[in-house]
Swiss-Prot record:
Species assigned in the record: Arabidopsis thaliana (Mouse-ear cress)
Chief location bin: cytoplasm
Start and end residues of each SAND domain: 18-116
Consequence the record notes for mutating C173T: In ult1-1; semi-dominant allele that induces enlargement of inflorescence and floral meristems, production of supernumerary flowers and floral organs, and a delay in floral meristem termination
Effect of S83F: In ult1-1; induces enlargement of inflorescence and floral meristems, production of supernumerary flowers and floral organs, and a delay in floral meristem termination
Cellular localisation: Cytoplasm; Nucleus
Protein name: Protein ULTRAPETALA 1
UniProt entry tagged with the keyword Nucleus: yes
PROSITE patterns xrefs: SAND
Gene: ULT1
Listed Pfam families: SAND_ULT1 (PF23292), zf_ULT1 (PF23293)
GO molecular function: DNA binding; zinc ion binding
Function: Putative transcription factor that acts as a key negative regulator of cell accumulation in shoot and floral meristems. Negatively regulates the size of the WUSCHEL (WUS)-expressing organizing center in inflorescence meristems. May act by down-regulating expression of WUS. Acts as an antirepressor that counteracts EMF1 action through modulation of trimethylated 'Lys-4' on histone H3 (H3K4me3) marks on target gene loci (including genes involved in salt stress response and flower development).
Expressing tissues: Expressed at low levels in seedlings, roots, shoots, leaves, stems, inflorescences, pollen, flowers and siliques, with highest levels dividing tissues including inflorescence.
Annotated knockout phenotype: Delayed flowering and higher floral organs number with extra petals and sepals. Increased H3K27me3 marks but decreased H3K4me3 marks on target gene loci. Plants missing both EMF1 and ULT1 have rescued normal H3K27me3 marks and H3K4me3 marks. Plants lacking both CRC and ULT1 exhibit strong floral meristem (FM) indeterminacy with reiterations of extra floral whorls in the center of the flower associated with reduced AGAMOUS and SUPERMAN levels.
Length: 237
């Protein structure tokens, strides 16, 4: 292990040494702790990767499933899909780390400590604002066929998946994170698209209750896009 002190030095001392001492592939960076992780598909086997845990609660995965794989900065949910896991959408249980030679789900480790704290902080922030603002569903168009696919934005993970898709000019149907689809799949009917999850009115076209202009749930401190950089700068100001 890179640090032999009583505490793992990562920003503001993320984890104690004994919490990580039996984990495989531990590496301590300037503002993160990195460990070996993976996800198992019954068809493709184990996809191995490296998980970085940041004090902000952000989780970032660099895939090493094959020597030529260049997938990095994946959310756990995106890595779960990339690995070919058949029962997706349960990344806390499906993505694992090696502890004492055994595969242990992330949900049973200390590695989600700051992620969970961040989620609770966002919930408290929303409650303090009256919990009146939510994130409605958004659509992202395929660069190949032009069909629009629905993204839910109810959690930080879901917001990050949509954020990444919006920032990718070459995004296509096969990149859809929730289901394996192709351009052959029909898009939602127009009559269905009007329902986007507004708590005030089911067919709302956008109001102060469902349109967010930036919060801790949908902006990311490690993202370098101008929108996130501006939000992070304003929060620190």
């Amino acid at each position: 292990m890179a640090n032999n002190e009583g505490e793992m030095q990562c920003g503001s001392m993320l984890f104690k040494q004994e919490e990580l001492q039996e984990m495989s592939g531990v590496n301590v960076g300037g503002d993160y702790v990195e460990v070996m992780c993976g996800c198992t598909s019954h068809r493709y086997g184990d996809a191995v990767a490296r998980l970085r845990v940041f004090p902000t609660g952000d989780l970032e995965i660099t895939c090493e499933c094959t020597p030529g794989c260049d997938e990095d900065k994946l959310t756990p949910a995106a890595f779960e899909k990339h690995s070919g896991r058949e029962t997706a959408r349960k990344w806390k249980n499906n993505v694992w780390v090696i502890i004492g030679g055994e595969k242990v789900p992330l949900s049973k480790t200390v590695l989600l400590k700051y992620y969970n704290e961040s989620s609770k902080k966002c919930s408290r922030s929303n409650r303090s604002q009256g919990a009146k603002v939510c994130h409605r569903d958004e659509f992202v168009g395929c660069n190949d066929c032009g069909k629009e696919r629905r993204f839910r934005l109810r959690s930080r993970d879901e917001c990050r998946l949509h954020h990444n898709a919006m920032g990718d000019p070459n995004w296509k149907c096969s990149d859809f994170p929730y289901d394996k689809i192709t351009c052959e799949e029909e898009e939602e009917r127009g009559s269905r698209k009007v329902y986007r999850g507004c708590t005030r009115s089911p067919s709302c076209k956008g109001c102060t209750s469902c349109v967010c202009f930036g919060c801790e749930l949908c902006r990311f401190s490690e993202c370098t896009c101008q929108t996130c950089v501006d939000f992070t700068s304003n929060v620190k100001a």
